[in-house]
């Protein structure tokens, strides 16, 4: 696993050689140079949460790490909030993410196109108290046709009538 660290950003990915990470690294380097901060590249070692400065906002992006050891990642999800850490866990299958520490500590779920089985499970887990499955399917279908890289948002910090369900980030459903 490769890792880049700045004072304010941490990107963790299984394969940093991908074009998107090369772009992100270049962009981050330019940003850090302007902010007089440094990016450090590490291999196969997650920094300890105790080393994160709680006085600065830190963003951690975990991408394509579902098959990696989850214990260090789980620590960030369960304890990171208290140290000013915001975590993003990017994966292809929501229900393969460890439940107790990662899924249960999620505030916002962003969904790209889903098959019927996963859509039903997401509905049953997060949505069933607010709308029936037919309405949820309609909402999801509208989200998926909104633009080229469409997605649906379920914001678990909000009420159903106050932006909990959105198409992209800006269009509330209920």
Name each region found by the language model:
Residues 145-174:
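Conserved P-loop NTPase motor module
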Residues 1-138:
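Conserved P-loop NTPase motor cores
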Residues 134-140, 155-160:
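A general structural signal for short secondary-structure boundary/capping elements
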Residues 53-54, 144-146:
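Extracellular/periplasmic catalytic domains that process cell-envelope and extracellular macromolecules
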């Amino acid at each position: 696993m490769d890792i880049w660290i700045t004072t304010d950003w941490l990107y963790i990915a299984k394969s940093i050689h991908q074009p998107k990470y090369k772009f992100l690294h270049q962009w981050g380097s330019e940003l850090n140079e302007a902010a007089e901060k440094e990016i450090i590249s590490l291999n196969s070692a997650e920094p300890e949460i105790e080393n994160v400065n709680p006085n600065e906002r830190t963003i951690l992006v975990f991408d394509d790490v579902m098959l990696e050891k989850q214990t260090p990642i789980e620590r960030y999800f369960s304890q990171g909030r208290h140290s000013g850490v915001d975590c993003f866990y990017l994966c292809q299958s929501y229900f393969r993410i460890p439940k107790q520490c990662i899924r249960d500590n999620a505030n916002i779920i962003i969904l790209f196109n889903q098959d019927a089985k996963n859509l039903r499970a997401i509905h049953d887990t997060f949505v069933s108290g607010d709308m029936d499955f037919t309405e949820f399917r309609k909402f999801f279908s509208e989200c998926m046709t909104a633009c080229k890289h469409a997605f649906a948002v379920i914001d678990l910090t909000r009420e159903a009538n106050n932006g909990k369900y959105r198409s992209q980030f800006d269009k509330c459903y209920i």
